[in-house]
């Protein structure tokens, strides 16, 4: 039983991670500022689901910003956390091109505030949500953690790589156990509306036009969110100094095949337009997961069709609870 701080706790991956920690008996303090491109009610709904968890008495939410060093220090001093799970970030490769300064402020400076608190108050484990985007346009795949990651394609990827390197320094200087988890194309219930899987469902159901890059021939390692959350929880217990670990399914699926799976489940056709892939987008993502299997006991067992079915069922259910008589807000 551990005391864990989870940043970004009200978000997509964060809320599933909180549930997984509560399921195993941990005490969780969630930190979230509810400031994202998505509608705030989506995060509020995630929190409402967390408060209905059978062990919700072990969950506390603090509404604050990771860049607020004073609040972060006070939280860590009050709760004496065994671990920090840092999931809060500005996400998205294309938006980072338009707002690169803000991405570095939130993603890098916010991480430094947390690393300083971990150093000052003796937090033993720091788990950081990195991304497969750090691999850039590498033509060697599946991607292994030993590959060079020195040519990111976007400010978002560069900001995540910067925090990985900061983690290496803090682990070396302050004996911090730091695990950077490189997530691969996460999807599932509570998907954000700016993510591809959600956009495709919006297109199938509401006819909203969605670009299909490179005729759908891009490959993605679609990884179900609950498998990711289990990997994050396992990393909390990793006491091996500095580690970088891929969390994917280990299987690259053509985007057009993923579209077809959603269309079959939803009984409709997506409104797609062919466009060349943006320069910031990776042509392929595919994880080698042997290291995660060895160090974390990681075993992603949700195949793409089962995960897509769970996403579709959640999508149908959450439409009824959306504001404005089921309007789901803009797709960004």
PLM regions with names:
Residues 1-186, 226, 302, 310, ...:
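N-terminal Rossmann-like NAD(P)+-binding domain of SDR-like oxidoreductases, especially those catalyzing
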Residues 21, 170, 199-204, 231-235:
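A short, amphipathic alpha-helix embedded in the catalytic core of nucleotide-handling enzymes
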Residues 43, 151, 189-193, 251, ...:
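Residue-level signature of the cytosolic catalytic core of signaling kinases
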Residues 127, 134-139, 191, 205, ...:
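Proline-centered turn/helix-capping motifs that create local helix->coil transitions or kinks
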Residues 141-142, 193-203:
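A glycine/serine/threonine-rich, flexible loop-to-helix segment
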Residues 162, 166-170, 200, 258, ...:
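Hydrophobic alpha-helix immediately C-terminal to the catalytic Tyr-X-X-X-Lys motif of short-chain
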Residues 204-332:
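C-terminal substrate-binding subdomain of Rossmann-fold SDR/epimerase-dehydratase oxidoreductases
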């Amino acid at each position: 039983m551990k005391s864990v701080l989870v940043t970004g706790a009200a978000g997509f991956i964060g809320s599933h991670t909180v549930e997984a920690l509560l399921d195993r008996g941990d005490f969780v303090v969630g930190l979230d500022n509810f400031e994202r491109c998505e509608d705030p009610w989506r995060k509020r709904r995630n929190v409402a689901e967390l408060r209905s968890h059978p062990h919700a008495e072990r969950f506390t939410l603090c509404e604050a910003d990771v860049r607020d060093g004073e609040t972060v220090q006070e939280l860590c001093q009050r709760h004496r956390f065994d671990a920090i799970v840092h999931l809060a970030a500005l996400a998205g490769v294309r938006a980072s091109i338009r707002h690169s300064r803000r991405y570095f402020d939130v993603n890098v400076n916010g991480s430094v505030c947390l690393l300083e608190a971990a150093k000052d108050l003796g937090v033993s484990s720091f788990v950081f949500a990195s991304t497969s985007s750090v691999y850039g346009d590498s033509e060697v795949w599946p991607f292994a953690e030993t590959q060079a990651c020195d040519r990111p394609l976007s400010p978002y990827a560069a900001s995540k790589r910067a925090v990985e390197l900061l983690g290496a320094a803090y682990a070396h200087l302050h004996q911090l156990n730091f695990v950077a988890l490189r997530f691969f194309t996460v999807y599932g219930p509570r998907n954000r509306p700016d993510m591809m899987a959600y956009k495709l469902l919006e297109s199938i159901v509401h006819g909203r036009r969605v670009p299909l890059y490179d005729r759908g021939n891009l490959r993605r390692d679609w990884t179900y969110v609950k498998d990711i959350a289990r990997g994050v929880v396992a990393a909390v217990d990793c006491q091996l100094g500095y580690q970088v670990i891929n969390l994917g399914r280990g299987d690259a699926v053509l985007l057009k095949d993923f579209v077809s799976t959603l269309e079959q489940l939803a009984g409709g056709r997506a409104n797609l337009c062919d466009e060349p892939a943006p320069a910031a987008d990776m042509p392929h993502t595919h994880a080698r997961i042997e290291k995660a299997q060895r160090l974390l006991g990681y075993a992603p067992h949700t195949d793409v069709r089962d995960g897509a079915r769970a996403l579709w069922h959640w999508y149908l259910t959450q439409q009824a609870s959306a504001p404005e008589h089921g309007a789901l807000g803009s797709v960004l």
